[in-house]
């Protein structure tokens, strides 16, 4: 069985991507965020360096995956880089990858809108880490090194009241996630096993989707691509304001170069928004 996972930050169309696979590829199981999702405490454990707890929980996912009688398993879960990437490759060293990249300004705004919406309907967002503090299930913890430059803490994200702080929180999460993506590809020499998607554009292009399937040597069910499936659409359109662009620029001006240098190289320089890092 071939396994494909995603390198991505979330709010990048990954639910729809899972449908593209299961609707178009023969003998394929396509999942988005299957149980165990690896959000919540596994994200906390990753930051705390507790691989053993992650490994113990991930074993349950492995057992489920191995029971599928199929040639291809695809999981488009953005928890991959947040919690279980280094453990997953222990079990699936031959895994293939899709690097799903979206404009960080829009990712941050989409995350902000989503967070506002979930708080409004009182959706249970939080969990308690092993330190007793509350964290948000689907985000980084705020304890990661990148946040220390700006004196972020988990209370800032949980007790959201400042638009600027929260938007910048999600910008930093995107930057951290992309750095993890490149580090993962370098560490495990996986560049040749990774396909890059520019979203949302590529998700709606038949030629590009076919090229991705060909990259992984997959057999399609039909000659033409079937474009259907659920999307995690928010209530608000993802419109980035001038003020939010200034919030982004402030972050970029203060971040150490070690977080920014990857955006001066491929694949990022091929994106039409790459000049925001200049």
What kind of region is each of these model predictions?
Residues 1, 139-278:
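PAPS-dependent sulfotransferases, especially Golgi type II membrane carbohydrate sulfotransferases
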Residues 1-68, 226-241, 268, 273-276:
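PAPS-dependent sulfotransferase catalytic core
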Residues 13-26, 87-91, 112, 195-220:
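PAPS/PAP-binding and catalytic site of the sulfotransferase fold
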Residues 13-18, 37-40, 81-84, 105-110, ...:
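Short catalytic/ligand-binding loop motif for oxyanion handling, primarily in non-cytosolic enzymes
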Residues 29, 96-98, 195-197:
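Hydrophobic/aromatic beta-strand patches that form the interior of the parallel beta-sheet core
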Residues 66-85:
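Glycine-rich phosphate-binding loop used to anchor ATP phosphates in small-molecule kinases
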Residues 91-114:
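Conserved phosphate-donor/acceptor-positioning beta-strand/loop module used by diverse small-molecule
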Residues 120-148:
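Long, charge-dense
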